[in-house]
Amino acid sequence: DMYPYFWLFGGTLTDDGFTKATGYLDSDASIAAMNKLIELHDQKIFTIRDVDGSVDAWDGINSEYAMFFEGPWYFGSYDDCEAKGIVAATIPTYEGRSASVVGGEDIAVFSTSKQKDAAYEFAKFMTSEEVQLAMLEAGQLPILKSLVENDAVKNNPVWSVYMKQMESAKARIPSPNNAAIQEIWSEMVTSIFVEGADAAQAMHDAAAKIDGQLS
């Protein structure tokens, strides 16, 4: 996921209301952020899995990599991370900024449900501290702010780091057309890093296309 690095170097996807990409994705700051990524990629400091075919964390990390970006579920799936020398750390800052991406699943009660009361009780149960702490063991971060200071989180060398990083996390563009927007982003990245397209022009074109998905 390139978004965190793009944000880290000062890039912006849209306005705060997620209504327009033109003027944001193709702003001077965003173009500078992309050029920084190009510079790091050319120096082989930064790799892009879908561009370089580089291995991801699930296929095995070796000493070739100093850092990789992965969600908390990675540590919930592998008990031997520490033995391999893999430890959780916040993303390095750049000009005082750090960045990450936040996502998740939804739980809802449908207005057409025949068992609204039971469904509501189930939703309350799933969002209770008891269940959220249990899900933490599987690598799912709790959704409750009340658990940030819980000892199970604070005293854990993995979960405490991820909760700290959440302070600078941003959401992907919340749109029913998100799949199309992701495709536009991917095509832009491919054109820049594989085909050698001019970053400014590629970002301008992508911004216009994303505008069409946001309208």
Specify the residue positions occupied by each region the protein language model found:
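Short helix-initiation/N-cap motifs at beta->coil->alpha
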Residues: 48-59
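Paired acidic/hydrophobic, glycine-rich loop segments that form the ligand-binding mouth/hinge
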Residues: 66-71, 87
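Long, aromatic- and glycine/proline-rich binding clefts that accommodate carbohydrate-like moieties
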Residues: 89, 136-187, 191
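Extracytoplasmic/periplasmic solute-binding protein
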Residues: 1-23, 65
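Extracytoplasmic/periplasmic substrate-recognition and gating elements
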Residues: 43-46, 79-140, 190, 194-197
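Beta->alpha turn/N-cap motifs
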Residues: 54, 69-75, 105
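Glycine-centered hinge/linker elements that transmit conformational signals in sensory
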Residues: 19-50
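Short, well-structured alpha-helical segments that form the helix of a local strand-helix-strand
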Residues: 199-211
